[in-house]
Amino acid sequence: MAKILYCSFCGKSQQEVKNIISGRDGNICNECVSKCAEKIRSTGSTSAEDISFEKLPKPVEIKKYLDDYIIGQDNAKKVLSVAVYNHYKRITSNLTKDDDTELKKSNVLLIGPTGSGKTLFAQTLAKLLNVPFAIADATTLTEAGYVGDDVENIIVRLLQNADFDVAKAQKGIIYIDEIDKIARKSESTSITRDVSGEGVQQALLKLIEGTVSSVPPKGGRKHPNQDMIQVDTSDILFICGGAFAGIEKVIKHRMDKVSIGFNSDVIQQKNSLDSDKLMQKIESEDLTRFGLIPELIGRLPIVTVLNELKEEDLVRILTEPKNALIKQYIKLFKFDNVNIEFTDQALVEIAKKAITKKTGARGLRTILENVLLEVMFHIPSSEDIEKVIINDKVILEQQEPILATKTQQQKQLKDII
């Protein structure tokens, strides 16, 4: 006589239910399987609700937060604050489905020179909103089937940063850097394949607009019979950034064409515009002439320009933000019970050096690391040094920093080596 099976969860026998599945240490009936599935589904939905936008910061609050970490770029801050607020407001609106009006998402295009803060903007916004964040380099992307990263691998990175919580990843932010580097070479469509240019732009279209993307859990190429994770990109905010070097000529050419005939005074005015003011005049047709396809431009409706950072901006970046570089080095030296001090003129010379190298804010850390290398190497082994002073001669003439001992004597670095 066959042994009667009982469900380990509800206790019902196999005669009382449709089916019972046996495992190594227990059994489960079809009714309990349904209840478990429902429980998992409801738990999954709460995971999506973990990112609650009921207390979403208002644009003014978002800008205030950006002010704490980013110097200058006021117009870009306002544009991004409104864009981010509207994006996440749109998500909650679409969830409620009060009416048939569906709000389309507005992805962002940031245009600005190297080191102007494009990546920092995206990182800071993700930190404020506590959403997963991923960075991709457009120059490494290729169309599916070619050597390089598939565009869908961007989603894999976001998933990894969300600890593979799909619901959280679907509310995240993706920053695609160097989008200008995948511009097609000419306005006319090429009959040859352009796997790292127009082809990548085409591949990005659906992803940025919103699609259900099937991605391999560990990235890489897709293979037959491979388990895939389904990720809906409809609510992911895409921020694309690029320097668009040389686009000023495209803008100027368009403006000069408009200002012909009797408008010679207007032409003169256009010619005298500096680079920053000229960039503020950018329009969609300029981006098309530069090499972005119109369809991609249409999916990046919010365009904002970041100005090139001036000397005074870089000095402020060194000292003012919450995580300013100088504050970071002060903290590092404190671990060795040493104070470090930078003179005002030293900060100016560091800023000038970054401008000369055309690296913007991005190059400030490299300059400081080079200046402080020997000090950071030897100071931990010297117990009597209390203070390090960096003046302009250390930056300009590569002189050794001034070292002060606990007895207020001054030493040179060579004295403690």
Swiss-Prot record:
The UniProt GO MF terms for this protein read: ATP binding; ATP hydrolysis activity; ATP-dependent protein folding chaperone; protein dimerization activity; unfolded protein binding; zinc ion binding
**Where ATP is bound, by residue?**
P113, T114, G115, S116, G117, K118, T119, L120
| Disulfide-linked positions | none
GO biological process: one example = proteolysis involved in protein catabolic process
Quick check: keyword Chaperone in the entry? Answer: yes
Enumerate the InterPro entries for this protein: AAA+_ATPase, ATP-dep_Clp_protease_ClpX, ATPase_AAA_core, Clp_ATPase_C, Clp_protease_ATP-bd_su_ClpX, ClpX_bact, P-loop_NTPase, Znf_CppX_C4
Which positions bind Zn(2+)? C7, C10, C29, C32
Task: Specify the domain of life of the species encoding this protein.
Answer: Bacteria
What the protein does? ATP-dependent specificity component of the Clp protease. It directs the protease to specific substrates. Can perform chaperone functions in the absence of ClpP.
Partners and quaternary state?
Answer: Component of the ClpX-ClpP complex. Forms a hexameric ring that, in the presence of ATP, binds to fourteen ClpP subunits assembled into a disk-like structure with a central cavity, resembling the structure of eukaryotic proteasomes.
Please state which protein family the record places this protein in. Belongs to the ClpX chaperone family.
Q: What is this protein's record name? A: ATP-dependent Clp protease ATP-binding subunit ClpX
Lineage of producing organism: Bacteria, Pseudomonadati, Pseudomonadota, Gammaproteobacteria, Thiotrichales
What gene, per UniProt, encodes this protein?
clpX
